[in-house]
Amino acid sequence: MVEPNTRLEEPIVATQSAASLVNLRDLGGMPTTDGTTTAHGVLYRSDAPYPRDETPSTVPVWPPAAVLDLRAQVERDDVGHEWDQGSKLYHWPLYDRAAPISRDAPNLVDLYRNILEAVPHRVAAVVDVAATAEAPLLVHCAAGKDRTGITVAALLLAADVQPDAVMDDYLATAANMTALRNRWEAKGRNITVAEAWLLTPQDAIEFVLDEFLSWRGGPIGWLTDHGARPAAIDAWRSQIRPS
């Protein structure tokens, strides 16, 4: 099980102020395949927080009870944020090569393929956090788009959220990317990254969805085949899908 406060081995624009998170949203209200919707106040996604950020007003509860930080250690060292004692931090570096720090333009389909092929067990392991963490759980990386997008897609599909809704949620990030670049500049990040790091191509998320949906047993089969516990998946589903 992923333990908190340790570094582990192994639709909808939130806010456009550089003083706060710009790619934050609550993933409640998303339609499921059986006609229900996901619960509010359970799962958030966002870009990386910065010290002295303003409190966001677009989510029902803040700070989150739990935080799943998917960034590499070098990213955390560069941009550190100390959460209140009431927020449990799970540091789970997903895939260091997905850090948006390169001037070389990435092919995001290839990047997402590499993540799912190279570290599928690390994607599947996030179910343990989601199943046991107190809500709301915030999942974030640097931009809240690539590593976060894959992780959130896995969690939502495991809860039977409609694939089109998962895709639309990923694409909604596009509206926040200019604000994200402005935020990075306002926070004094002296990096120049290729514009492709801030794109949200539909074919990239379609590739991810197809990988999960076409797997034997669907998204749940993909997760269990890569190490997720069925009991954890059931517990997660009971949290995100109100009875």
Predicted stretch roles:
Residues A143, R147-T148:
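Ser/Thr-glycine-rich phosphate-binding loops at phosphate-binding pockets of nucleotides
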Residues M1-L138, T151-S243:
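Cys-dependent protein tyrosine phosphatase-like superfamily
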